[in-house]
């Protein structure tokens, strides 16, 4: 998407990516007959919350991605497992001990190191990236709260449809940019990746152990560092690497403590 933003409008790119993602999701949803099911008010409310959170996440994360180095955005996003732990304690009544609270505070210190508020290296879009983490947390918690009988494909389709409609409305009054073959290839790649990631992410959050699933998020930081250097010549500085290390270390420690507590029950 970062490459795509160099050629076409922000919301046009989001619209086309979501539009390409819709047909395969619709086919899967129709085959599973998941769109004909009736859902409880609770599940309808959670799905709506998830759609709104996903729209907000898409806009904030991709805005930060457009204007910030790839590694910086990804490093800030690594605070998500810590944010989920904090949200679970505050809103779901999950018991979090002082060690995990300490890990959360240290992890967000790493975020502040990357953001560098008030310093010369401060980028205001870092705050936009941080907002995406908050919205991602809302999305993940709402996903986790959905009843197990709600089909994953229905959640994925409704979310993608919501983003498509939102992006289409955002394009009203703007000039449509001609899309060349290279951009179409990027759109197809992005749509394929986000479709698979959406489905797997929903399944993982609903059926997997969060302490097992969350560490896999940290592997994206390695990929982001490599892609940033390869495609954009973005070499992360020492401060960014330090902040990223603190976030990842704190996240693993928090998940380690969660595993110990789960094993003792």
What are these regions (language model features)?
Residues 22-49, 150, 161-189, 199-209, ...:
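Membrane-interface interhelical linkers
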Residues 61-63, 80-102, 222-241:
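C-terminal transmembrane-helix exit sites in multi-pass transporters
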Residues 99-116, 239-258:
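Hydrophobic transmembrane alpha-helices of multi-pass small-molecule transport proteins
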Residues 41-51, 96-108, 125-130, 149-161, ...:
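Cytoplasmic-side transmembrane-helix entry/capping segments in multi-pass membrane proteins
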């Amino acid at each position: 998407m970062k490459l795509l933003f160099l050629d076409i409008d922000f919301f046009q790119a989001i619209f086309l990516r979501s539009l390409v993602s819709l047909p395969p999701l619709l086919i899967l949803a129709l085959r599973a007959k998941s769109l004909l099911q009736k859902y409880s008010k609770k599940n309808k409310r959670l799905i709506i919350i998830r759609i709104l959170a996903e729209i907000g996440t898409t806009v904030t994360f991709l805005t930060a991605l457009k204007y910030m180095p790839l590694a910086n955005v990804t490093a800030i996003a690594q605070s998500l497992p810590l944010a989920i732990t904090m949200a679970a304690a505050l809103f779901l009544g999950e018991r979090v001990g002082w060690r995990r609270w300490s890990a959360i505070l240290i992890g967000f210190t790493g975020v502040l190191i990357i953001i560098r508020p008030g310093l010369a290296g401060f980028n205001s879009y870092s705050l936009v990236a941080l907002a995406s983490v908050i919205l991602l947390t809302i999305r993940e918690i709402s996903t986790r709260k959905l009843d197990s009988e709600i089909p994953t494909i229905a959640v994925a389709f409704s979310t993608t449809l919501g983003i498509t409609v939102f992006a289409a409305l955002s394009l009203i009054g703007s000039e449509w940019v001609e899309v060349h073959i290279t951009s179409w290839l990027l759109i197809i790649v992005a749509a394929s990746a986000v479709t698979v990631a959406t489905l797997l992410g929903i399944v993982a959050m609903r059926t997997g152990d969060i302490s097992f699933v969350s560490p896999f998020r940290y592997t994206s930081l390695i990929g982001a560092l490599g892609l940033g250097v390869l495609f954009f010549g973005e070499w992360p500085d020492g401060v960014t690497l330090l902040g990223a290390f603190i976030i990842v270390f704190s996240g693993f420690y928090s998940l380690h403590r969660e595993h110990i507590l789960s094993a003792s029950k």
